[in-house]
Amino acid sequence: MFLVNSFLKGGGGGGGGGGGLGGGLGNVLGGLISGAGGGGGGGGGGGGGGGGGGTAMRILGGVISAISEAAAQYNPEPPPPRTHYSNIEANESEEVRQFRRLFAQLAGDDMEVSATELMNILNKVVTRHPDLKTDGFGIDTCRSMVAVMDSDTTGKLGFEEFKYLWNNIKKWQAIYKQFDVDRSGTIGSSELPGAFEAAGFHLNEHLYSMIIRRYSDEGGNMDFDNFISCLVRLDAMFRAFKSLDKDGTGQIQVNIQEWLQLTMYS
């Protein structure tokens, strides 16, 4: 979709096959992950509707302004290349070759990972880390992860897409553990800014408040699956913004079709 095609071009920076994987693959992938270090109401007349619209636009303008400021400081890893699984580089490291073999076991005959398969493998991995508080990765979370990484709109992740996502999850897991200073298994609201900055996201207070309301519990604590889900979406949205802001002004223009593609398939 538009979102992924945009951020993959940007510079800088379902079948449930998982159930039959067995403990071996889950154990190996568990080792890989630990290797990283650890509007206004319209009723009552036209005047009310107009006031609500103005309020909504001011809120939206503030959010977009905050995102543009943050995006200017974000330097993501290079996006995954669009290469087929069979295009094996001669100079691949043994670690990458091992990961490719594991991917073949996980992906099955179609050599792509569905949202259900992604959910199964992530939940196998987090069970090996009791220090990470989580309710588990749900299917909606995994569908969102697949959607923002799905460059060819197949609804599944190819090898490079999956490897890019997996490497980010490893990096963010290490950051999560580092900033869980009270060892509660969650990231508190006071710990969150440092964790996000370590991941490369410099946000203002307004955006932090929005993120806490969306991804944290009533006490302001964010568990591991919500932390990963939030960062996956931030990474994708920042890439999309940077690729659309071709002249570097911090402003973009999109039509309704582009806006719907940005917001609905993510």
From Swiss-Prot:
GO cellular component: calpain complex; cytoplasm; plasma membrane
Residues holding Ca(2+) 2: 150, 152, 154, 156, 161
CDD domains from the UniProt entry: EFh_PEF_CPNS1_2 (cd16188)
TM region(s), chain numbering: none
Presence of the UniProt keyword Signal in the record: no
GO BP terms, alphabetized: proteolysis
Residues annotated as binding Ca(2+) 3: 180, 182, 184, 186, 191
Tree of life domain: Eukaryota
Binding site for Ca(2+) 4: 135, 223
Chain positions with N-acetylmethionine modification: 1
Notes concerning its domains: The contact of the 5th EF-hand domain from each monomer allows the formation of the homodimer and also appears to mediate the contact between the large catalytic subunit and small regulatory subunit for the formation of the heterodimer.
Role played: Regulatory subunit of the calcium-regulated non-lysosomal thiol-protease which catalyzes limited proteolysis of substrates involved in cytoskeletal remodeling and signal transduction. Essential for embryonic development.
The name this protein goes by in its record: Calpain small subunit 1
Protein species of origin: Sus scrofa (Pig)
Gene coding for it: CAPNS1
